[in-house]
Amino acid sequence: MLGGCLSTGTQSVANSVSQLVRSNIEIDYDDTKMRAAGAGVLQAQFGGRGSVYMGLHSLNLQTYDLLFVSNDGVGLEMYNGHIRATTKLVADIRSVTPLSGDPFFDGFLELHPAKTYFWKIQSASGYGLVAHARYRFSGTEQIKTAYGSWDLAHWVESWSVEELDYQVDNHYWVDKQGIVVKSIQQPLPDHERMDLLLYSYKPVVTQ
């Protein structure tokens, strides 16, 4: 069981992560094996190209970041669906760090559209970049994973990096426990737009 001081939303995320990390894989995607082992599988599209499947490789016990790795070595480090670092992409992110609160930690609870969040980004585009983000609710949509279709809250992230004159809307689909199941993200202009789905997702069953 993951320890530490966690919010209610983050505890749900941590419980889900615990279930996934029990099977730590770096293998070719196998639907039967995924279902039998409860393995973490991320379905990813980069720049609108075909889907690739990335296996859950490891969990950082200090930050609770999940590292998903593809067969060709591309890595996405994520905290509750939010990209925190990448490896072996055309342009990589070294780190994304929250500076004033973190809606992904809080499980998207009590978000106000007027509240601004700040993120420090370290990447090849520049050191010490700061992104500004606001979040607004955009309704409920049905998202399909390997285990079924689920009604999820759609949140739009208005993301901007003033130093690069860059603005974009990123999208997150979140379950009732605050877990990000699907996202569309492009943190910086020299990165490809990433469409990410936690393909192995199924709702956490509470006792």
Residue map of PLM features:
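Acidic, serine/threonine-rich low-complexity disordered tracts
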Residues: L6-S95, E110-Q207
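Active-site acidic/histidine clusters and adjacent loop/turn architecture
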Residues: P98
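A small/polar (G/S/T-enriched), proline-flanked helix-loop surface module common
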Residues: G101-P103
